[in-house]
């Protein structure tokens, strides 16, 4: 009888998932007394910490009362949907973490639906009950309604609820009586989460995730489904296409605390990492060499969006970056394919650009941002959705969009979404907020987030997820305003910007270096405007240069990477270097642009 519990944690961004896991690790005495307790232990790459999102699923385990609890952290974001399904396959139960004030959110729904379909047993944790005006009882009912609407079984609906505050480090069965520690939660896990079934027979393991090490290459991570795996065992890798490849296990590690520990053998029900198997894909089976039986493969989410990646060929090429040639960028993209599953890289006609396919703007921008920090320079074109031909009809990806926002600005948002070919499927009001659901083409979502936040003064919460391919919906107006383009290369002067303020809003500040063909602002009209922002005031001997009028300029609009990618038009690129991000026309020369435009 093994004392193992495999549990996945499901939560919305910023409901305290990573903090809770930190506290569970503490309870399992992973950090020695007196050793500094780290924050956000699981989000261990800088990007994850800054954005507060978990991108890659991770595994840790703790020992408690002689039980081994494997904790599997899932990404909450629908752009990383490929990660979610695979990871839930390793668990027997799930911890649904909700904020006692906000209640379950659209993104939580996405992961929870997958978990319920797989038949996982849930435990609900109502977090942040120490906050004033929290409403645990109402939230409890909301969770019940949500599970009911996702067709949960009676057994799943009979879930225990634990209340507490991960930040203060306590959990209790009654929210009015705080305890000292989180043992109430750990006891509930042992009591309610079923133990993994032990299946005797020839060994089988489904590869659900992979790790990468520069010493041994790709490492297969998964849960042993049946039998046991031993070090040095001869195995068969059952591929997706039905073929079999013989291989041998060099080393087996199990997860122990935050790291891995080498073991001789691992039994069914435990999660392990296997070193020495080459050329595997996620969703394939490792089986006994003498009697190979493949498990059903898992489908990985298809990409729905593509962007052109190309080398930086702007006049400021190579000023900041360490890696700037096409060779560097190509190698880096190939390396990313090893661990990023929903990604595809396709060469184009030219030797220095590639089409990169991904799950959405966020998915691709996380890759670009990671590359930027590593010292790469590159340029990226406008995001395009992937169009398929189904039964001779042109089809495009359609997503389900949920928006939660204050009632007074709902009409503006509905108008905005319907202009982008969205159709409303549901509308309900709760207290003073509206909950809206739409189906909308993926093309319509590009750039929508910004517009929705502006129209609702930052109050709206928006989430979307891929639904299916549907027939093409027709043209969608993206951005109607033209661009303001720099005429010459040089330094921008306040004097020039001041005279041009009536022409639109600027993205640059005085003193910034610009080059000819760079997009420096947004024109108030719908055509492009070429201006000289490098002009300074000419002075005679009579005028001292200091006695100029003080210039008052509106502050420049600053874009985040996603905003810029969603903002640019089809004839523009975003140039990304370690220290800066600029938008530019693909053809820098004005005369050449006019010639092409004819």
PLM feature segments, named:
Residues 15, 31, 77-78, 101-104, ...:
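Conserved nucleotide-binding/hydrolysis micro-motifs of P-loop NTPases
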Residues 148-282, 286, 401-404, 465, ...:
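Conserved catalytic-core segments of large NTP-driven translation/proteostasis enzymes
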Residues 292, 300-432, 445:
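Charged, conformationally dynamic linker/hinge segments
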Residues 225-351, 373, 555:
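Catalytic P-loop NTP-binding/switch module of NTPases
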Residues 94-156:
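Conserved C-terminal guanine-recognition region of P-loop GTPase G domains, centered on the G4
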Residues 255, 260-263, 395, 440, ...:
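Long insertion/accessory domains within large nucleic-acid-processing enzymes
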Residues 30-57, 80, 146-159, 190-203, ...:
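Active-site phosphate-binding and catalytic loops of NTP-dependent enzymes
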Residues 1-104, 142, 210-213:
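P-loop NTPase switch module centered on the Walker A-proximal segment
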